């Protein structure tokens, strides 16, 4: 009854559940996804037609579903006997893939509604026949492997009875009473044919009896799918190859390589449908994942340009394309598709199509996918040739470096030139190498121009450069006007010119050495004296005696200027000579200056004390006295003028007249 109520819900409520999925609770999200898959299987729109056939367990049931709401083409669902638990886990992984595709198609519903209605009419003619042939081989193989009895409870489908009284013409879903069966996708054994169908198609959802045990099944599925996929890949002979990020960008940027991935798979699926149907279920699931990844990663503009396929092109949303382009640099080719499938199954479906589809990996199943390896080999050969050139150039420069003193700098410049050449050949060096190549190119041009000058000018240039820039390095300002990068041809010509002018450089070296010797002699002849040397000590030196505190003659006076046996000794005594010669005007002047300084200091101290005392007095005494009313009246009474009488007024008038 609960399933019947879910089946009666309208289509918009079913797709509304996708937006209501919570990102925090992964367990409730998986249960809800299983319920959505049941609703997608059991809801019958008004435009759907179902063929009901009552057959035995070994017979196949073909369900042709046309969903105009989603804009998908005919849908195929085969009812087969219960299989082993490993097949059920593989089908669960495929069901998760179908749910991811359903989310993508739901996002693109409003934009591509008009295109998908016209494309679904064209796809009705050729698809059912091919799917019928695919189902014939896959059902027989799966029926032969029915050995596990416990899988019957896991794969049992709930019988559904669709009762719609309002519309009697609406078909009903099949009600299986004979034995429990499960819906297995016909597209699982034929993962290659998914490239022919529209990208909007989704696989029919599978239904299970116990959705609460999905976590346990997923944990077991992670181990079983990885082991089975590794064995199948070993038998099929797939080889793994780690490709760099640069090669993957080249691979996805070329449109012809895009066709090389899609067209051979179409031819294989159309020419040999029975052979693809006998592939194991795990391998088919892997190919289904690869086809989904290829449709998600490759630009859809190339698919829409092919008019013969009649498949509608789906332009991926902006966020999805941006995430794919940002993460393409980190995608590497892996040899185990089962690992990518297990990682995709383990993720919650509600995280969005961009994050879940980015976990898929790409396997190169055609020889065209290995095309970038040829260009890689050519790049490696070019790098080896450039390395050989560097080694030979280094040997030549070492031979030239031993001939003179200027050669080490030239060898360093040439080694920088070889580094710049390697950087231009590879094309992906850092900015430091570009700077070195620019500076080395300017140095090489300077050397080549100096060597190509006439013999009379070349020695002079070398002399100036060696004399001035002996202790200096090449200035970076000289390379500002030079180009930052040079082509291979220009560098080759420069190296050839340097090798030709090596003889002229060798002849210039002796002249350079002679010029250095001349300049060195000229520098040694120049005598530079210090200012202290030009200022001699005074003739009379006096020493202050600590005891007498007076000036006394020093030993320099008697030893340098006085005769050992002066005549004055016989006439004048030593005390008189000392008194006469002890007079020093400098000492008197210094004494006077010190007295003046002392007097100034005393005056300053007195002035500061006076200021301090006046400040204290001003603070102690009241500078303003507040008068009372009585004092004001007394002051007015005392200073009031006498009243003017008549007599006094007449006297004043008479005086004025």
UniProtKB/Swiss-Prot annotation:
Residue stretches of biased makeup (Polar residues): 143-169, 234-243, 301-312, 462-484, 499-513
Residues with Phosphoserine modification: 114, 213
Regions of compositional bias (Low complexity) in chain numbering: 437-451
Keyword Lipid biosynthesis set for record: no
Origin superkingdom: Eukaryota
Pfam families xref list: DUF4614 (PF15391)
Keyword Phosphoprotein annotated: yes
Acidic residues compositional bias, start-end: 343-354
Annotated region (Disordered), positions in chain: 142-216, 228-248, 291-312, 335-354, 399-522
Record-annotated disulphide pairs: none
Ranges annotated as biased composition (Basic and acidic residues): 190-206, 485-495
Alphabetical keyword list: Phosphoprotein
UniProt cross-references to InterPro entries, sorted A to Z: C19orf44-like, DUF4614
PANTHER family from the UniProt entry: CHROMOSOME 19 OPEN READING FRAME 44 (PTHR22409:SF2)
Protein name per its UniProtKB record: Uncharacterized protein C19orf44
């Amino acid at each position: 009854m609960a399933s019947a109520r879910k089946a009666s819900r309208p289509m918009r409520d079913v797709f509304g559940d996708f937006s209501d999925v919570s990102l925090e609770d992964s367990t409730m999200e998986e249960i809800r996804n299983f319920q959505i898959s049941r609703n997608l299987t059991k809801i019958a729109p008004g435009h759907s037609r179902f063929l009901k056939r009552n057959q035995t367990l070994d017979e196949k049931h073909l369900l042709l579903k046309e969903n105009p709401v989603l804009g998908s083409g005919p849908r195929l669902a085969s009812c087969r006997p219960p299989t082993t638990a490993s097949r059920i886990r593989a089908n669960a992984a495929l069901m998760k893939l179908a749910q991811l595709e359903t989310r993508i198609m739901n996002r693109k519903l409003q934009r591509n509604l008009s295109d998908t209605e016209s494309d679904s009419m064209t796809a009705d003619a050729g698809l059912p026949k091919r799917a019928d042939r695919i189902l014939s081989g896959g059902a027989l193989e799966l029926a032969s492997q029915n050995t596990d009895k416990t899988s019957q409870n896991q794969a049992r489908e709930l019988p559904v009875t669709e009762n719609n009284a309002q519309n009697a013409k609406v078909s009903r879903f099949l009600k299986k009473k004979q034995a429990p069966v499960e819906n297995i996708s016909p597209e699982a054994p034929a993962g290659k044919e998914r490239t022919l169908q529209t990208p909007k198609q989704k696989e029919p959802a599978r239904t299970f009896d116990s959705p609460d045990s999905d976590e346990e099944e997923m944990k077991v599925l992670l181990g079983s799918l990885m082991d089975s996929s590794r064995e199948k890949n070993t038998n099929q002979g797939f080889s793994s190859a780690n490709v760099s990020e640069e090669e993957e960008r080249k691979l996805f940027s070329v449109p012809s390589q895009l066709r090389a991935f899609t067209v051979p798979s179409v031819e294989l699926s159309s020419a040999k449908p029975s052979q693809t149907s006998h592939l194991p279920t795990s391998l088919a699931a892997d190919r289904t994942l690869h086809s989904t990844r290829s449709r998600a990663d490759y630009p859809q503009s190339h698919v829409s340009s092919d008019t013969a396929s009649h498949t509608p092109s789906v332009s991926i949303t902006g966020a999805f394309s941006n995430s794919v382009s940002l993460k393409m640099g980190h995608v590497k080719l892996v040899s185990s598709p089962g690992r990518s499938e297990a990682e995709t199954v383990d993720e919650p479906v509600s995280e969005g199509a961009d994050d879940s589809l980015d976990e898929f990996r790409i396997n190169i199943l055609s020889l065209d996918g290995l095309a970038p390896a040829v260009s890689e080999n050519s790049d490696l050969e070019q790098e080896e040739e450039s390395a050989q050139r560097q080694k030979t150039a280094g040997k030549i420069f070492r031979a030239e470096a031993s001939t003179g003193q200027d050669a080490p700098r030239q060898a360093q410049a040439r080694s920088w030139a070889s580094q710049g050449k390697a950087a231009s050949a590879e094309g992906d060096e850092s900015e430091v190498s570009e700077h070195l190549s620019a500076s080395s190119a300017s140095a090489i041009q300077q050397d080549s121009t100096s060597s190509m000058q006439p013999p009379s000018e070349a020695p002079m240039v070398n002399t100036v450069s060696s004399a001035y820039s002996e202790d200096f390095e090449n200035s970076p300002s000289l390379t500002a006007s030079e180009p930052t990068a040079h082509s291979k041809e220009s560098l080759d010509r420069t190296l050839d010119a340097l090798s030709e002018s090596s003889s002229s450089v060798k002849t210039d070296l002796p002249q350079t050495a002679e010029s250095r010797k001349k300049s060195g002699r000229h520098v040694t002849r120049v005598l530079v004296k210090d200012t202290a040397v030009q200022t001699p000590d005074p003739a009379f030196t006096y020493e202050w005696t600590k005891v007498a505190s007076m000036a006394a003659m020093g030993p320099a006076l008697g030893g340098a200027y006085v005769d050992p046996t002066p005549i004055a000794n016989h006439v004048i005594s030593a005390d008189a000579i000392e008194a006469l010669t002890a007079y020093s005007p400098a000492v008197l002047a210094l004494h006077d200056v010190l007295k003046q300084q002392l007097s100034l200091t005393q005056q300053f101290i007195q002035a500061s004390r006076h200021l301090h005392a006046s400040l204290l007095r001003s603070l102690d005494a009241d500078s303003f006295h507040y008068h009372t009313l009585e004092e004001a009246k007394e002051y007015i009474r005392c200073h009031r003028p006498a009243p003017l009488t008549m007599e006094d007024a007449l006297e004043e008038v008479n005086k004025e007249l």
